[in-house]
Amino acid sequence: MLPTLNERVVELAVRTGMALNCEVHQESKFDRKQYFYGDLPKGYQISQYDLPLCFDGAVDIPSDDPDIGGGGTKRIGIIRAHLEEDTGKLGHELPGGGSYAGSLVDLNRAGTPLLEIVTEPDFDRVEDVLVFARELRSICRFLGVTQGVMQKGHMRFEPNINLVIDTTDGREFRTPVVEIKNLNSFRAVEGAIRYEQSRQLEEFLETGRTMGLGMKRTRGWDDQKLVTVLQREKEDAHDYRYFPEPDLPPVEMDVEWRE
């Protein structure tokens, strides 16, 4: 069965992008993002690479960050908002809460439309991350894009975290970036970020590892143990071997429809 795109999905994505003060590409397209993982049995994901629907936006959030004087606003840049298909879900628990040594694959949500919003790295406080996350959920709820029930997976957050460490001799080091996948509660977002701050500092002091090509990792959040756990090494974008999706035509929007 070939993939199809419905107009309603594009409408909701563009509506969200405009609410985030994004520019909207008049012509957009889809691409195949190729990688191997248990939740993606076909070996590629339909996504958008170089021509996302929406790009270059910003959201102002209230912030008590002392670096901006406290009690002001902080601008969070939006790099892009693009459509892609959702993947499956890997589980490691049995009904009733028992643990399972392997992985249970749930493909019920695979192929459903997903809007991914990517921010600039404008956060340096976990408090601002939480304010932004709640603001984003409020915007999407108001627009009717989602019910925003976190426990049902309506919204998931995937923070990318690393530290900038200044040493006493005046040098600056940046730890490798870690992406925490599929956080479905604000408590999990806060817990994962705070844990990673401590873990990455400890790792740097032990190993001296710093940011570099191919050093990015993907970790998950264990809600029971309150720790992050390694899931896989994260490939760089060029390793995904993006190429235009042959089974979906480009998306062209005229000005009247957009307005």
Question: Where is each model-derived feature located?
Answer:
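Basic, nucleic-acid-interacting segments
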Residues: M1-E259
